[in-house]
Curated annotation (Swiss-Prot):
It comes from Rhodopseudomonas palustris (strain BisB18). It is found in: Cytoplasm. Gene3D superfamilies: S-adenosyl-L-methionine-dependent methyltransferases (1.10.150.290), Vaccinia Virus protein VP39 (3.40.50.150). This is Trans-aconitate 2-methyltransferase. The lineage of its organism: Bacteria, Pseudomonadati, Pseudomonadota, Alphaproteobacteria, Hyphomicrobiales. It catalyses: trans-aconitate + S-adenosyl-L-methionine = (E)-3-(methoxycarbonyl)pent-2-enedioate + S-adenosyl-L-homocysteine.
Length: 256
């Protein structure tokens, strides 16, 4: 994929940050020394960590140059590094690894979660949140349109970039032997958005990118028109004209 677009991502900053707040609230540490925010994006989640633990050394990690540029502007004086979390290891002494909406993009992420828990200090925390929405209309429609002509050959690989998340029991079996305590839960958010086009704008910042990035501008416009029509049918307006974007998310908090 092309580089992430921080400006597009931040169009729905409050809604995207809410799960990070909910995840952070479940970390039972008062005074961590080192904290890593992996998949930090434009720094909205990193800012939450800095505010909660101002005494800690907080480092943001991401693969996107544009996201890191935005994060450094947002939090000058804090440490941000460009790295792939599939190969990144937390520095010695790390107490918290915070992973908000990133592991869904990492193949075989269970093994990486095991590796990160193993690298934590005793009592350290791996806190993870992932969208669990591939079976929601917003994402089903992406694939349905992509499987049509004239896009089906060009977008054949797009639907393979993300797999459905494993069942909660798989996370439990993989992580429980490494932990003193393990919490796993789902939360379903119902985000109030202006209209169907707002849903399209939301997913253009994340899940829709593998489908539109490979397309030239005329093809992209045609794809988006077909996708938007399906979204409008799948998300009818409420009595006040707004629409509700149903968004399930999986949370995991592993305490070593």
């Amino acid at each position: 994929m092309a580089d992430w677009d921080a400006e597009q991502y931040l169009k729905f900053e409050d809604e995207r940050t809410r799960p990070a707040r909910d995840l952070l609230a479940q970390i039972p540490l008062d005074d961590p020394r080192r904290v890593a925010d992996i998949g930090c994006g434009p720094g909205n989640s990193t800012e939450l960590l800095v505010r909660r633990w101002p005494q800690a050394r907080v480092t943001g990690v991401d693969t996107s140059a544009d996201m890191l540029r935005q994060a450094r502007e947002r939090l000058p004086g804090h440490n941000f590094i460009e790295a792939n979390i599939a190969h990144w290891a937390p520095p010695v002494g790390t107490d918290v690894v915070f992973a908000n909406a990133v592991f869904q993009w990492v193949p075989n992420h269970l093994k990486h979660m095991q590796r990160l828990v193993g690298a934590l200090e005793p009592g350290g925390v791996l806190a993870v949140q992932m969208p669990d929405n591939l079976d929601e209309p917003s994402h089903i429609m992406m694939r349905e349109v992509a499987f049509q002509e004239p896009w089906r050959h060009q977008l054949a690989e797009a639907a393979q970039l993300r797999d459905n998340l494993p069942k909660p029991g798989a996370y439990y079996d993989a992580l429980r032997p490494l932990c003193s305590r393990l919490e796993i839960w789902h939360t379903v958010y119902n985000h109030v958005l202006d209209d169907a086009m707002a849903i399209v704008e939301w997913v253009k910042g994340t899940g829709l990118r593998p489908f539109i990035d490979p397309l030239e501008l005329p093809e992209r416009k045609a794809y988006l028109a077909a996708y938007t029509a399906r979204i409008a049918a799948a998300y009818p307006p409420q009595a006040d004209g707004k629409v509700l974007l149903r968004f399930p998310r999986l949370f995991v908090v592993a305490i070593k």
